Each structure stands twice: as C-alpha cells, then as structure tokens.
A protein has these predicted regions:
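A short, structured beta-strand/loop element
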Residues: 21-48
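Negatively charged, low-complexity tracts enriched in Asp/Glu with abundant Ser/Thr
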Residues: 1-22
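Acidic, low-complexity intrinsically disordered segments
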Residues: 38-76
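Short, surface-exposed, charge-dense and proline/glycine-enriched linear segments
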Residues: 9-13, 33-34, 70-76
C-alpha cells in the first residue's frame, strides 16, 4: 500500500493516509474548508468503486467522491 500523500482538488489540499479495515484497505482523508475547519473521512472500495464514509460531511466533499477516488487510483 502507498505511503502518505496529498492532492490539490478544487483549490483545497486533501491529505491521504493508508489504513487497513480488517482484511480490506482504504484511506483516511482530511481537508480544511475555507473557514479552517478540518473535515475527516474514510475512503474504501466496494465493487471496484471508491466510497466515502464520514459523519456530517458538507455537500461539497460528498460531491467530490468520484474525483477523490480517481486521485487515489492515480496515486496507486
């Protein structure tokens, strides 16, 4: 699995840290919004598609789910 990495998406820096969920792998992701609030969530694969898991995430993060998944694929 890859090491830590970051990617600029829509003018925001997303930070990715590899994680293991039992026998599966995924990423812990964090990003700050314009006000400086740090949002944290997990990305994991289901049926070869990256899915987001997190609580009370703003819609602008949810809207980037496929873009974030593509960034992970490009890094791996």
């Amino acid at each position: 699995m890859s090491n830590l990495f970051n990617k600029i998406i829509n003018d925001r820096q997303f930070n990715f840290q590899p994680l293991e969920f039992g026998h599966e792998t995924g990423y812990h992701v964090d990003v700050k919004d314009k006000e400086g609030t740090r949002w944290e969530f997990r990305m994991f694969q289901i049926d070869d598609k990256w899915k987001m898991e997190g609580e009370k995430l703003p819609s602008w993060i949810h809207d980037l789910e496929s873009v974030i998944g593509k960034a992970i694929d490009a890094h791996e």
